[in-house]
């Protein structure tokens, strides 16, 4: 879940429990020789202003833009943090999951898209963003800025099974599951 707004907390008596950090990495096909991008270049590519890989030191070939669906948390972080709420070109191909994004980029040598850091594997190549490697360590330290906190939200103070579940999420076992899922556990704050 997302961070609660003050209005929601006041109106519904909600409480937030941050439990993990999620990072977003820009990715290309492993055959693409481009391995770095700046925030401005990302904004220009996704806005349709840069349309050829040659502008980034790559091949003289058109860039194919991939994005996530409206409502995707990954897209929300990407648009807010990487694009600074800038536009995404209307011709962008829309995919509905991190897995679908990896498949699309893995099959398109001219594609660029983004996935959660925990989903980066050999099927895609993650780009450094403003000279920072998109790693779990850099996301946890705050050095890599394309991140967001994930929250558990409850109405009022948690009790019973809800409290037990939240305690479990913060336990070593819960932290291991969070890591295995590709996120970075925050521990109890």
Please describe what each predicted stretch is.
Residues 1-189:
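Exported/periplasmic ABC-transporter solute-binding proteins
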């Amino acid at each position: 879940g997302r961070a609660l707004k003050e209005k929601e907390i006041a109106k519904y008596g909600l409480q937030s429990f941050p439990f993990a950090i999620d990072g977003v990495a820009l990715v290309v096909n492993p055959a693409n020789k481009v391995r770095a991008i700046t925030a401005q270049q990302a904004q220009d590519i996704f806005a349709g202003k840069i349309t050829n890989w040659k502008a980034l030191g790559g091949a003289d070939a058109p860039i194919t833009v991939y994005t996530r669906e409206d409502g995707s948390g990954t897209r929300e972080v990407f648009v807010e943090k990487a694009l600074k709420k800038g536009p995404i070109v209307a011709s962008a191909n829309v995919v509905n999951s991190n897995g679908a994004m990896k498949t699309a980029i893995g099959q398109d040598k001219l594609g660029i898209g983004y996935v959660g850091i925990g989903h980066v594997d050999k099927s895609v190549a993650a780009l450094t963003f403003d000279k920072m490697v998109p790693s779990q360590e850099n996301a946890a330290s705050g050095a890599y800025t394309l991140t967001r906190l994930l929250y558990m939200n409850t109405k009022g103070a948690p009790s019973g099974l809800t409290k037990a579940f939240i305690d479990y999420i913060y336990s070593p076992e819960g932290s291991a599951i969070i890591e295995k899922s590709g996120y970075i556990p925050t521990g109890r704050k």
